[in-house]
Amino acid sequence: MSIKYPKYPNITIIGAGSYGTAIAIALSRNGHSVLLWGHNAIHIQKLQINRCNQAYLPGIAFPPSLYLEKSLSIALSTCRNLLIAVPSRVFGHVLMRLKPNLKSNTRIIIASKGLEPKTGRLLQDVAYDILGKNIPIAIISGPTFARELAMGLPTAITLASNDTILSCDLQNILHCNKNFRIYSNTDTIGIQIAGVVKNIIAIGAGISDGIGFGSNARTALITRGLVEMSRLGIAIGATLDTFMGLAGLGDLILTCTDNQSRNRRFGILLGQGFEIHHAQKNVGKIIEGFYNIKEVYMLSVKHKVDMPITEQTYQILYQNKNVHDAAHSLLERTQKEEKINGLK
């Protein structure tokens, strides 16, 4: 028997992992009719039967207005607002699958955090390249753990778009006075760079805690990590204000200090002496920072941006550098003046 979906409001979410499911639950609980699609038909069928994502968000029931769909063409057939929440390494592939079925008036909301593998391109640029320059695009990012969002706990994020009319419209659609606050921004570059670099700094902060360096060291890494994030973003065309907001400082603090963060947990295990593959297996889910650090390091070299925490973390992950040696390399750097305006 086919399911008859409501025509409005029209939000389709691509990606039935923890974050995509959490957003779907939050939006449907806040009064929207939401369609959730995932690439694994068996997984979607389980969600339909259980009315819960037991694999990622156990114990959190789906609201009645959250619909599940196995067919991509059907999921896109009534879609006006399309929110994409898939890992960055498959983002381009997913867009290629979406393209033949997209309606001409579809607006894209990118919830994925990361860069295109090997090229280091921003996901917004990947979307423009595949779907065309005229498609309306917004990016959402900020301090959001999936489980807290799905539970209805208060959450605030940033929505960025070059199109201020689109930004205002989507802000009104997604915002909920009860528990989901949306701030608008026009710096799409900054919001994307922040969402990538914060995962790398979280791995570094986790390594520090795993070694046992304590709160002083963690706070220093967060603060200097914010400088690295800002340096890279500004070199690419972002504005400093973005990194002082929810998508920058907010998400950085959350990811570096709370053990719900996969990247932080991964770093802690490395600091405790676990081999990389054992730490990955222990965390059990995709660790975006592990993959994206290659592209971030590549961008830092390309744009001649000094990112010592990123560099040392990269050497730990991909050049077999000992975690203690990496820590000493950071501490032994030449002394310098701290000047935030100049991002020294």
Curated annotation (Swiss-Prot):
The yes or no answer to whether the keyword Oxidoreductase is present is yes
Taxonomic superkingdom: Bacteria
Q: Provide an example Pfam family for this protein.
A: NAD_Gly3P_dh_N
InterPro entries reported for this sequence = 6-PGluconate_DH-like_C_sf, 6PGD_dom2, G3P_DH_NAD-dep, G3P_DH_NAD-dep_C, G3P_DH_NAD-dep_N, NAD(P)-bd_dom_sf
Q: Which UniProt keywords apply?
A: Cytoplasm, Lipid biosynthesis, Lipid metabolism, NAD, NADP, Nucleotide-binding, Oxidoreductase, Phospholipid biosynthesis, Phospholipid metabolism
- SUPFAM superfamilies on file: 6-phosphogluconate dehydrogenase C-terminal domain-like, NAD(P)-binding Rossmann-fold domains
Q: Catalytic activity annotated for this protein?
A: sn-glycerol 3-phosphate + NAD(+) = dihydroxyacetone phosphate + NADH + H(+); sn-glycerol 3-phosphate + NADP(+) = dihydroxyacetone phosphate + NADPH + H(+)
Q: Which pathway, per its entry?
A: Membrane lipid metabolism; glycerophospholipid metabolism
Matching entries from Gene3D superfamilies are given as: N-(1-d-carboxylethyl)-l-norvaline Dehydrogenase, domain 2, NAD(P)-binding Rossmann-like Domain
Give this protein's Gene Ontology molecular function annotations: glycerol-3-phosphate dehydrogenase [NAD(P)+] activity; NAD binding
The UniProt record gives the binding positions of sn-glycerol 3-phosphate as 113, 142, 144, 198, 251, 261-263
| Location of the active site | 198 (proton acceptor)
What does it do?
Answer: Catalyzes the reduction of the glycolytic intermediate dihydroxyacetone phosphate (DHAP) to sn-glycerol 3-phosphate (G3P), the key precursor for phospholipid synthesis.
Name of the molecule in the record: Glycerol-3-phosphate dehydrogenase [NAD(P)+]
* Organism in which the protein naturally occurs: Blochmanniella pennsylvanica (strain BPEN)
